[in-house]
Amino acid sequence: MEAFSVRFESASSIEERKEQTRNARAEVLRQAKHNFEKEQRGEERKRLRDEDTWMLPDVHERIEQFSQEHSEKKKKKKDKHSKKVKKEKKKKRKKQKCQKQSESTDSSASSEDEWVEAAPSQISDKEKTWKVKDKRTEEECDSHDIQRDEWMTIDFMSIKTVSSSSLKAEKETLRQIEREKTQVLEQSKLLERELNPYWKDGGTGLPSKTCILPVTKAKGVEDGGLSWLRKSCQRMKEQAQKENRNFEDIVAEKYGSMEIFQSKLKEAEKIAYKKEDCGWERWRKPTYSDRAQCSQASGTSDLVKCKNLSEDRHLEMEPANSSNYKFSGPDTGKRSGTLQTCRRESALRKNQDSSGNLRSKFLRPSDEDELSFHKRKNFESSSSYSPLVAQASLHCDFRKLTENSEESSASCSRSDRRQENRKPSDKKPLETWSYNANQHSTGGRREQLQAESMSCDPPGRGLQQDMTLTIAGPEAESTYILNVDEKNKLGAKIIKAEMMGNMELAEQLKAQLKEANKFKETQMPAKRLGVEHEDEQEVILIQTDKSGRMWPVSSPRETLDMKAERRKRKRVSTHEDKERVRYFPDDDHLSLKDLVKNEKIGTDINQNRLFMKMASKFMGKSDEDNYTLDDMFVSKAAEKEHLGKKEESQRRRAIAEHQSLAAKMAKCLYCFDSSQFPKHLIVAIGVKVYLCLPSFQSLTEGHCFIVPLQHHQAATVLDEDVWEEIQMFRKSLVKMFEDKELDCIFLETNMGLKKHYHMVYECIPLPKEVGDMAPIYFKKAIMESDEEWSMNKKLIDLSSKDIRKSVPRGLPYFAVDFGLQGGFAHIIEDQYRFPHYFGKEIIGGMLDLEPRLWRKGIRESFEDQRKKSLQFAQWWKPYDITKSKSS
């Protein structure tokens, strides 16, 4: 036979590969930290240089003027509102007075007929009734009766004063508390998703020394010192590993030689196994306990190698009081059944033992992995048991009681004594198992629930006792959130327990389910705190077409039926008496006005999308000449659509469009609300438009931008007032450069309509000689640009009409104007091949400039930008149209 070649890998190569990954991670972290610190330093430098706050003084005054106008408008609105409220209050008061007067007149009219005795006036003897009191005495009496208000009698010197520093300190404490709350919420979310057990519950990432529970070993009784010798072997092995010595030398120091130690072990094994022989005949089939003895004898023969007995691990959880749950004795009537069940159980335990090792590698780590890590690491792995083994060992515990229970229990107890590492309590092993399961995480609890479900099968007294042991101690058991499957399993166990008559178990399981539900209710609000703090925005959803027209999206008239999605669409009758009555199911509900409105609102994109959807679904169903494409569309149109599906799809599309537009505007370089907007480059602010300078190095001295305040994409979609103000800025710029004996060119490039770029109208000054030759250069470049065979006219003359009247809305274009004269326009056929720097490239060629100036632009420092803006502001001051407007 050919030997199969196995590829081995040395430990040094594995360690080297790990070291490389560690170094790579460290390098990535170092680079990220370096970049972050660099950004922080840059922001700090900007803050120190006032890059974010510095503006031209004229611009600052203009912004303050805008804010004052805005505040005055708000005040006027408030005054109007307050006046309305006052008028309403006056009306209410008048009504109330009228009602009171009417009530008083009614009461006086009714009380005229009644007689009332007057109270006798107590007048002193000195004073006569006919004498009139002096005014002074009346004033004195009034002064004695009137009391001052409480705030007038307060000693203001005793009032505690509040300083600005104390207010700042209080605000800082409140902010600190809010930060701590947010950190706690974030930490709780991270802890829920944490897979490493050593990071959970505030861990350090490394196993703590206290997490290893001290495990006391059960003493073997009447085993001839076998357990003691095994423990001694284990300790000698550990000593040899710690001191890096030979195992045989340590054995020779303690026992004289290895042969003496092996002879003692053999004698102890003989004494231990001699008592297990029950005088059974050789021809009889071996029972479960016999097979356990054989497996143990074969496992202990090679104790020098210190290997654990994997065959005996399924007996570690056997209860010491197994007299209640017995294997059948030597009765011939009951022997065959017990032998078959024991065989099944032993095979099942072996399978679970072998699968448990593999399964543990692919399970999500839980809290109980902390203990299993140390148990697998040391030689004490035999003392640890997995929940699967514990579950398997419980199969033999829950059995019917037999007559010869004592004989079978003796064999089970002897097999338990042979285990070298056991839990401390021999009397209540199930109780210890439930305690460990409660101590650990959800994995142990799920296994406990499985054990409870197994316990519900056979009724009996011993069954109820063990069930109380496994379920006992709900106080010590920490509740956790159950998922849907676990709740279903728990409900099935409750029903099963009620059917078997075990009401105590059913009540306990119900209480457990109730506690889990309560725990879930208390935990869910804490998780939603972060969502509640988020600001909700109320937005009018709009739909925009290519031409820039916008209209609000109508809310669904009928709620979307989710169940109807799964049903087949119903066919609507389209013909009556062999005549076509309708094409679509909603033809009866739509008037001619509605149809015209839908046709105007609908875009070519929607029609193409609908066409592609229908064609892709039914292209395979065409039957050559019998079932053509037209028939397919006609039959599809006759099917009734689901309720509200069309409106819901439009709403979803509008929400996605709004979100993408908001994200683009947040990063826009020319929007006032953007965080990246360079305020120090603004020169003048109008009503709808502002004038600014480029953030990169200018092509020529005086290079500037005319930009609308609102986020518009192109000149073809602008309103009339915005376009008029742009033309006013254009005229003043032309006049300014004419006085300096310069000519100027205005450029606009509208590309990438889906990306929602901000419209920029560039003004580039040129010398007079170059400016006179510019129309020839641009005309030739436009004729040679783009596709050879174009769908639209290549060169559009703008001398008689401006760009808004020459190019339809929604088309990408390039436009150039020469001073106050007209210019040329070109509709872009292929946006991917047409360069965005087309106009600047032509000017760069005319002036013989470096390509890097007009390709991406060279960055400028803040000082250079400030000098540039101050110089341009001096040029612009005599021609500023914003000041003339404001004055």
Swiss-Prot record:
Protein's UniProt keywords contain Coiled coil: yes
Cross-link Glycyl lysine isopeptide (Lys-Gly) (interchain with G-Cter in SUMO2): where in chain: 168, 597
Record-annotated membrane-spanning stretches: none
Biased composition (Polar residues): 433-442
Phosphoserine: modified positions: 71, 354, 366, 478, 622
Keyword Phosphoprotein: yes
Chain intervals with Basic and acidic residues compositional bias: 14-72, 124-143, 342-352, 414-430
SUPFAM superfamilies reported in the protein's UniProt record: HIT-like
Keyword vocabulary terms for this entry: Coiled coil, Isopeptide bond, Phosphoprotein, Ubl conjugation
UniProt feature, compositional bias: Low complexity: 99-110
Renumbered residue ranges of the record's region Disordered: 1-143, 315-370, 405-447
Coiled coil (UniProt feature): 11-103, 164-254, 495-524
Basic residues: bias regions: 73-98
Family: Belongs to the CWF19 family.
UniProt xrefs under PANTHER family: CWF19, CELL CYCLE CONTROL PROTEIN, CWF19-LIKE PROTEIN 2
Protein name: CWF19-like protein 2
Organism: Mus musculus (Mouse)
